[in-house]
Amino acid sequence: MMKIITFKIPEETLLLLDAYAIKHNMNRSEVIRLAIEKLVVDEMKNEPVPRARVEKIKF
């Protein structure tokens, strides 16, 4: 299930986003999801997942 988010973006960036969307026959949401995936998901694939250190509780 996808969540709806709202954010502000500079008008110049929005114009570039729209131009990219038109060129690639995509809508704004598709372009934004692709950009986030490229930036965040691809980068995180190369980093280890942080894990919390948990110690046993002694009774």
UniProtKB/Swiss-Prot annotation:
InterPro entries the record matches: Arc_rbn_hlx_hlx (IPR013321), CopG (IPR002145), Ribbon_hlx_hlx (IPR010985)
One Pfam family hit: RHH_1
GO biological process: regulation of DNA-templated transcription
Entries under Gene3D superfamilies matching the protein: Met repressor-like
Stored SUPFAM superfamilies: Ribbon-helix-helix
Name used for this protein in its record: Uncharacterized protein 59
